[in-house]
């Protein structure tokens, strides 16, 4: 049997896996495209995103471990809280390919709204199991509100732009 820290570490690191896959869309051409877009003055510098997302993914991953542990593993009771978590995480991981890969700012905004709703539902479900796990999601919910607002502003201010060229209306 594995030492108790192994599942804790696995759950904590798991959310970052999708981040690594999605990050390939945030390099090279995707970044050049993004650099050419109109952005509000309050948008964060690029170097902030790695530490912020790394911290948020680690917190939500550890929270999922707390829920898993409290419910005795992948039991019937864990289906809703861990299912909601998995769903919001998949939606979260879909954002970089939608925004940077397909350059679909409007659909990326829809994705973020879905992520936010699923993350809020996850927080409520987790609170019933482990208030600490739910509290670990609070910074994530705040960041989602910020990034959703940022995505909206970028979409609004660049409506009709794709790849540096104006699209026909």
Swiss-Prot record:
Tissue: Found in many tissue types. Expressed at the highest levels under normal conditions in tissues that synthesize steroids.
A GO BP entry: negative regulation of corticosterone secretion
Free-text function comment from the UniProt entry: Can bind protoporphyrin IX and may play a role in the transport of porphyrins and heme. Promotes the transport of cholesterol across mitochondrial membranes and may play a role in lipid metabolism, but its precise physiological role is controversial. It is apparently not required for steroid hormone biosynthesis. Was initially identified as peripheral-type benzodiazepine receptor; can also bind isoquinoline carboxamides.
GO cellular component, one term: intracellular membrane-bounded organelle
Domain of life the protein comes from: Eukaryota
Residue intervals on the Cytoplasmic side: 27-46, 101-105, 156-169
Bilayer topology annotation: Multi-pass membrane protein
Keyword check for Membrane: yes
Localization, UniProt: Mitochondrion membrane
Listed transmembrane segments: 6-26, 47-67, 80-100, 106-126, 135-155
GO terms assigned for molecular function: androgen binding; benzodiazepine receptor activity; cholesterol binding; cholesterol transfer activity; transmembrane transporter binding
Subunit structure: Interacts with TSPOAP1. May interact with STAR. Interacts with MOST-1. Interacts with TMEM97. Forms a complex with TMEM97 and PGRMC1; the interaction occurs in MIA PaCa-2 cells but not in MCF7 cells.
Mitochondrial intermembrane side: 2-5, 68-79, 127-134
Chief localization: mitochondrion
InterPro entries for the chain: TspO/MBR-related_sf, TspO_MBR
Keywords recorded for this protein, A-Z: Lipid transport, Membrane, Mitochondrion, Receptor, Transmembrane, Transmembrane helix, Transport
Organism of origin: Homo sapiens (Human)
Assigned protein family: Belongs to the TspO/BZRP family.
Protein name (database record): Translocator protein
């Amino acid at each position: 049997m594995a030492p108790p820290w192994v599942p804790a570490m696995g759950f904590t690191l798991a959310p970052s896996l999708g981040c690594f896959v999605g990050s390939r869309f945030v390099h090279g051409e995707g970044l050049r495209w993004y650099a050419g877009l109109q952005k509000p003055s309050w948008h964060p510098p690029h170097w902030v995103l790695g530490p912020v997302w790394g911290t948020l993914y680690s917190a939500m991953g550890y929270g999922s471990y707390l829920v898993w542990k409290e419910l005795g593993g992948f039991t019937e009771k864990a289906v809703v809280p861990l299912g909601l978590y998995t769903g919001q995480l998949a939606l979260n991981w879909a954002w970089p390919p939608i925004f940077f890969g397909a350059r679909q700012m409007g659909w990326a905004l829809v994705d973020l709204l879905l992520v936010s709703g699923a993350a809020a539902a996850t927080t409520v479900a987790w609170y019933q199991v482990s208030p600490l796990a739910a509290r670990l999601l609070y910074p994530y919910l705040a960041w989602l509100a910020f990034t959703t607002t940022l995505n909206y502003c970028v979409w609004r201010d660049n409506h009709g732009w794709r790849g540096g060229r104006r699209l026909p209306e």
